[in-house]
């Protein structure tokens, strides 16, 4: 396995939240110089509380987080977990903790969105209260209600791929279902899961780039089978090429680092990934 150097491949919470309306384009200082946001999927820190995950994302140098349903808040809130049913006072505590750490909540997922409009609307309401950019889901069967609410709330819907044999394992198949749909409907391209499904991530991204709203970005040792996550630039996935292709198609969304390895001690590795993306951003500015 060859380590790749970025340089060899080349010819930035309410104060922050107030900079954009819910679902509107992400703006500076959350956007980096290359025009996208760098966040950490809180699932990377699933062994910790949400408050700790926010602190760890900040320590790693990220500008945002992607929250998921079921993580304990921690602190004075004990075993209370995050989700669409969370009480307003708990939600306000999260917002204040984000602000304290100069972190923006950008996406919520991966979350199931039901066809029932009232229940689906509850998810969009929590996204609105958190001023989120997008909702990450695999509920393709709820596409009609997702499209309706994505337009109403001006929030991106990002269809995520888990590995084969899950239903959305191949984004090229999902793309057919998105033809003619509103521009807020698109993808959260999980790069590591593409590799686990023996799909070349760069090839897939080239085909779906105009619909990509967010990433779950990973580096791996193989493009044909499951291998564990590792710091960006130490594996075989062409991360600069993937980001270049997305940016060519106008990508200005959320790049969420999802690091599913060394669960209790992965902060230094997540920080390496953030640093890699910062270097990419500077070189592409």
Summary of predicted features, one role per range:
Residues 41-43, 68, 109-111, 138-141, ...:
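Active-site-proximal beta-strand/loop segments in catalytic clefts of secreted hydrolases
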Residues 67-92:
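Glycine-rich, proline-tolerant flexible connector loops at the mouths of alpha/beta enzymes
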Residues 38-48, 107-116:
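Active-site mouth loops of central-metabolism enzymes
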């Amino acid at each position: 396995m060859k380590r790749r150097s970025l340089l060899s491949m080349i010819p930035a919470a309410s104060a922050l939240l107030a900079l954009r309306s819910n679902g509107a384009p992400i703006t500076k200082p959350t956007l980096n110089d290359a025009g996208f946001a760098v966040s950490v999927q809180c699932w990377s820190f699933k062994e910790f509380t949400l408050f700790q995950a926010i602190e760890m994302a900040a320590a790693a140098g990220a500008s945002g987080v992607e929250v998921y349903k079921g993580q304990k808040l921690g602190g004075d809130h004990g075993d209370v977990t995050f989700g669409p049913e969370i009480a307003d006072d708990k939600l306000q505590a999260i917002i204040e903790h984000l602000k304290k750490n100069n972190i923006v909540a950008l996406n919520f997922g991966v979350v199931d969105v039901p066809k029932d409009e009232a229940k689906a609307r509850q998810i969009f309401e929590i996204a609105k209260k958190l001023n989120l950019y997008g909702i990450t889901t695999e509920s393709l069967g709820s596409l009609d209600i997702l499209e309706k609410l994505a337009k109403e709330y001006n929030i991106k819907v990002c269809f995520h791929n888990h590995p084969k044999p899950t239903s959305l394992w191949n984004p090229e198949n999902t793309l057919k279902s998105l033809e003619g749909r509103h521009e807020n409907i698109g993808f959260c391209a999980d790069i590591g899961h593409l590799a686990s499904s023996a799909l070349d991530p760069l090839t897939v991204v080239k085909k779906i780039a105009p619909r990509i709203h967010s990433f779950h970005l990973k580096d791996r040792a193989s493009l044909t089978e499951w291998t564990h996550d590792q710091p960006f630039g130490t594996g075989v996935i062409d991360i600069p090429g993937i980001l270049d292709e997305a940016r060519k198609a106008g990508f200005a969304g959320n790049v969420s680092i999802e690091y599913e390895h060394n669960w209790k001690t992965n902060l230094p590795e997540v920080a390496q990934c953030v640093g890699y993306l910062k270097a990419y951003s500077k070189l592409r500015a």
